[in-house]
């Protein structure tokens, strides 16, 4: 069977299924005729033999062959139908539900990232989408610096958030946008108390510049578009007050998430980030001195799955709608301890003011355990005496 390259993948699958079912039907007819002829010839030979001693055995054999013949005539269609249905379900699962590792070459999807490429997490996210064959547009304040090397990178383009010409060209070149990733600065060092000017500059360059750019993009969206907001919320959830910049950033992202949920043209989700690790070093929350989750498994693949679920086949979109309870549950947790800190009293375990880190907690639990064991040992020795 020759595959037609111009047909849609769904048409090719149904053509393949029709071809397979038709060939299976022809083959089953030939097998049925051959079995019937064999049974008739064997029955004829048995009936022609005049052996009184084996007359009872011959009658039993003829009954068995007759039963097999009737069974083949009645149930061959059922078996063929079950086989064809199983094959269609398997092909449907591989086509509509199972995600390929990369975007198929025939598909072209555009992702817009609002963030600074100097941040290691943002830079790794951009390169992961690029490796998965997405066309990536990056809206960053340092666009002029990266545009000098734009010719050396296919499918990666840069937009200056303050340049109207860049946005005009973007609206012309990109008629359909798959997803928007709102990524403020995600990797911080302990900031402590900083001046108002430094805090204002940091918040403006990390959030408000991209917030203004997003407001200018929303009126040009022709359909409901996915918006994923990244929130460095671990510091705020742990009540670490000496990380003021990160806490304020997390609070602003929470507020913007609630605001954008009211927009009809946006399908908004937020990702609360835990500890992520690039290579052998943690890339964020370094003050906790803990190993993080691998960024490829903990962040890159979930983001890729979210994009494909919102822009894939209708069955995949339906499955995503069911798993998120109709879009009601739109908060995702990526990275180590990201979901754990949402539990009550989780901050007491990590908070420096209570002087309870994981190592100290483990040491205290070990002491309590040893004291309990020693108590029971003493009581047992006294009872034996």
Curated annotation (Swiss-Prot):
<dbReference type="GO" id="GO:0005741">
    <property type="term" value="C:mitochondrial outer membrane"/>
</dbReference>
<keyword id="KW-0496">Mitochondrion</keyword>
<comment type="similarity">
    <text>Belongs to the UPF0744 family.</text>
</comment>
<protein>
    <recommendedName>
        <fullName>UPF0744 protein YSC83</fullName>
    </recommendedName>
</protein>
<dbReference type="Pfam" id="PF08643">
    <property type="entry name" value="DUF1776"/>
</dbReference>
<dbReference type="GO" id="GO:0005739">
    <property type="term" value="C:mitochondrion"/>
</dbReference>
<keyword id="KW-0472">Membrane</keyword>
<dbReference type="InterPro" id="IPR013952">
    <property type="entry name" value="DUF1776_fun"/>
</dbReference>
<keyword id="KW-1000">Mitochondrion outer membrane</keyword>
């Amino acid at each position: 069977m020759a595959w037609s390259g111009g047909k849609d993948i769904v048409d090719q699958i149904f053509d393949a299924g029709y071809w397979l079912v038709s060939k299976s039907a022809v083959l089953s007819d030939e097998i049925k005729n051959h079995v019937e002829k064999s049974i008739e010839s064997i029955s004829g030979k048995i009936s022609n033999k005049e052996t009184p001693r084996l007359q009872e055995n011959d009658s039993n054999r003829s009954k068995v062959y007759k039963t097999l013949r009737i069974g083949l005539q009645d149930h061959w269609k059922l078996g063929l139908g079950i086989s064809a249905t199983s094959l269609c379900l398997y092909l449907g699962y591989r086509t509509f539900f199972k995600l390929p590792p990369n975007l198929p070459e025939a598909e072209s999807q555009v992702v817009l990232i609002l963030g600074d490429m100097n941040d290691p997490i943002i830079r790794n996210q951009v390169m992961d989408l690029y490796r998965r064959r997405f066309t990536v547009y990056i809206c960053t304040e340092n666009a002029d610096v990266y545009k000098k090397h734009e010719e050396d990178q296919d499918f990666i383009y840069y937009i200056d958030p303050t340049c109207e010409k860049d946005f005009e060209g973007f609206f012309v070149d990109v008629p359909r946008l798959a997803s928007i990733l709102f990524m403020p600065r995600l990797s911080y060092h302990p900031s402590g108390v900083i001046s108002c000017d430094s805090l204002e500059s940091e918040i403006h360059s990390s959030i408000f510049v991209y917030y203004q750019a997003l407001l200018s993009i929303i009126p040009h969206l022709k359909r409901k578009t996915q918006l994923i907001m990244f929130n460095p919320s671990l510091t705020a959830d742990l009540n670490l007050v000496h990380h003021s910049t990160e806490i304020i950033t997390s609070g602003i992202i929470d507020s913007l998430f609630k605001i954008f949920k009211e927009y009809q043209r946006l399908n908004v989700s937020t990702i609360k980030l835990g500890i992520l690790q690039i290579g052998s070093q943690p890339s964020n929350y370094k003050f906790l001195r803990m190993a993080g989750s691998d960024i490829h498994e903990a962040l890159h693949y979930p983001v890729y799955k979210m994009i494909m679920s919102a822009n894939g086949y209708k069955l995949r979109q339906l499955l995503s709608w069911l798993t998120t309870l109709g879009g009601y549950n739109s908060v995702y947790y990526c990275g180590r301890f990201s979901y754990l800190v949402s539990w009550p009293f989780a901050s007491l375990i990590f908070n420096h003011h209570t002087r309870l880190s994981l190592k100290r907690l483990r040491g205290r639990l070990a002491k309590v355990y040893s004291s309990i064991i020693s108590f029971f040992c003493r009581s047992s020795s006294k009872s034996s005496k």
